[in-house]
Regions:
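Switch/coupling sub-region of P-loop NTPases
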Residues: 196-209, 218-220, 249, 255-289
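Conserved protein kinase catalytic domain
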Residues: 93, 168, 239, 251-255, ...
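Walker A/P-loop
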Residues: 222-264
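Short, exposed beta-strand "edge-strand" segments with a Pro/Gly-rich flavor and a Y/T-containing core
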Residues: 155-162, 238-245, 276-282
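Peripheral, non-AAA+ core regions of ATP-driven protein-machinery
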Residues: 1-236
Length: 289
């Protein structure tokens, strides 16, 4: 086998942002047939070898029978999670000549694979889409859910990939996929049946007035009083009277939730501002991470 090199564009999550990672696959090297993974992979990334092997064979494709080196370039950056399964599998297919695609550089690709070859959800779809747009990539390939988050980013084609087989047929031109459209238009329907309501507060005229002024002007507010006087009860009801986030704020909120793996239901849960109530004894590290 002549040595062949394939490069697939992917990403790594760094906090709530994504940074570029190149998945380089080199097959046909002389030596004992085995797979070597380099580029600071963590345990989940190292295990991708076994997942990719099963996913390829269950998709009717084959692993190379030569020594193969996979490098996750951006080598000083720690790679975490199973998001490189799909780019590694596609890199192996390109390097072994099982997939011919002459416009691979147009795409940013990430996704976890199950043993059957189906894709599984990943964190940080929105951050990866923002990165793909910054890198001037034409399109991004992501598993379901992550793809729906990514569709919120304008100026980028987002394709939802459900299996390795579908990805190979799409990239080789045998299959046409329709890019996802942004779910922003559906932003009006949100059911708030169980939200605490500011109208539930009985009495407390002075506190209510202070809260309304703070919310209207975007000010900080401290409530001091004995236990049971209603501080927490009032605080829980403040999000209900805050204005809905602007589109930019909405994307910022979503980026944080996406990086934490807290996916949105159908795309638009955050028409109300998220409220967090850390305990007053919390340490700095617990609060800020």
């Amino acid at each position: 086998h002549p040595a062949m090199l394939a490069t697939i564009g992917s990403a790594a999550l760094l906090g709530i942002d994504a940074v570029p990672v190149q998945v380089e696959v080199n097959t046909g090297e002389s030596g004992v047939p085995n797979l070597i993974l380099v580029g600071l992979p963590d345990a989940a990334v190292k295990e991708s070898e076994d997942r990719v092997f099963s996913a390829l064979s269950n998709s009717g494709l084959r692993m190379p029978r030569t020594r193969t080196t996979i490098n996750l370039a951006g080598s000083d950056l720690r790679k975490e999670g199973a998001i490189y399964d799909l780019p590694i599998a596609l890199g192996i297919l390109v390097a072994t000549g099982q997939l011919i695609c002459d416009h691979l550089t147009d795409y940013l690709i990430a996704g976890e694979l199950s043993l059957s070859g189906a894709t599984r959800p990943i964190k940080g779809g929105l951050a990866m889409a923002v990165l793909a747009r910054e890198l001037r990539r034409r399109a991004i390939l992501l598993p379901p859910v992550a793809a729906q988050e990514a569709a919120l980013v304008e100026g980028l084609l987002v394709y939802e990939i459900t299996s390795l087989d579908q990805a190979t047929r799409f990239l080789s031109g045998q299959l046409k996929l329709t890019p996802l459209t942004s779910p922003r238009g559906t932003a009006t329907t949100v059911h708030r049946d169980h939200e605490p309501d500011f109208a539930d507060i009985k009495g407390q005229q002075a506190v209510r007035r202070a809260v309304e002024v703070a919310v209207a002007g975007g000010h900080n507010l401290i409530m001091i009083g004995p236990p049971g006087s209603g501080k927490s009860m009032i605080a829980k009801r403040i999000p209900g009277i805050m204005p809905s986030p602007t589109l930019e704020e909405f994307l910022d909120i979503l980026r944080i939730h996406s990086a934490a793996g807290q996916t949105m239901n159908g795309g638009l849960r955050f028409l109300q501002r998220p409220a967090r109530a850390p305990h007053h004894t919390i340490a700095d590290v617990g609060l800020l991470g």
